[in-house]
């Protein structure tokens, strides 16, 4: 089941992000989220703006992600998006590590909202790149988060 996150979920969300940061470091990607990203404040903002989602099953919270219908960092791309149509962007995707399939569940949810899906990731995040490629996204160039943090940009038109 996928549902909107609430502030009651904050502790569990931040625990998932803590596990994800450790996993990223252990798999050769120490820089994407460092020690403190996503920040508590950015998670609260996403909850308040009703764009943070929880993936849960009988086992409890399996993963978390945000779904944006616009991202200012995507306005300037060193490359070219597949089209300029309205889109959704998957951000802050993380799993608790207990069960596979979190990426696919988030992607299927995004597909239910739009046929235009964008996502970005760090050049060292090989696990995310593999998930992106397995799901037929096209690499379209590079974007810069907050104008400076380089990310690989991908686009899927369903």
Region spans (language model):
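A short beta-loop-alpha structural element at the N-terminal edge
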Residues: 1-15
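Conserved GNAT-fold acetyl-CoA-binding loop/helix
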Residues: 22-41
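A short helix-loop-beta-strand connector motif used in the catalytic cores of GNAT acetyltransferases and
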Residues: 42-54
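Conserved beta-strand in the GNAT
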Residues: 54, 60-69
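Conserved acyl-donor/pantetheine-binding loop and adjacent beta-alpha core of acyl/acetyltransferases
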Residues: 66-98
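Conserved acetyl-CoA-binding loop-helix of GNAT-fold acetyltransferases
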Residues: 95-112, 129-134
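Conserved GNAT acetyl-CoA-binding A-motif
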Residues: 112-124
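Conserved catalytic-core motifs of GNAT/GCN5-like acyltransferases
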Residues: 120, 138-152
């Amino acid at each position: 089941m996928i549902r909107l996150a609430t502030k009651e979920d904050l502790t569990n969300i931040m625990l998932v992000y803590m596990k994800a940061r450790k996993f990223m470091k252990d798999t050769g990607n120490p820089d994407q989220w460092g020690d403190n990203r996503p920040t508590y404040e950015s998670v609260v903002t996403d909850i308040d703006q009703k764009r943070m989602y929880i993936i849960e099953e009988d086992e409890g919270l399996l993963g978390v992600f945000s779904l944006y219908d616009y991202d200012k960092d995507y306005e300037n791309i060193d490359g070219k998006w597949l089209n300029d149509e309205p889109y959704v962007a998957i951000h802050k995707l993380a799993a608790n590590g207990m069960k596979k399939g979190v990426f696919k569940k988030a992607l299927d949810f995004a597909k239910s909202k739009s046929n235009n899906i964008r996502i970005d990731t760090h050049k060292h995040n090989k696990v995310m790149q593999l998930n992106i490629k397995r799901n037929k996204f096209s690499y379209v160039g590079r974007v810069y988060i907050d104008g400076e943090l380089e990310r690989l940009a991908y686009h899927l038109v369903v």
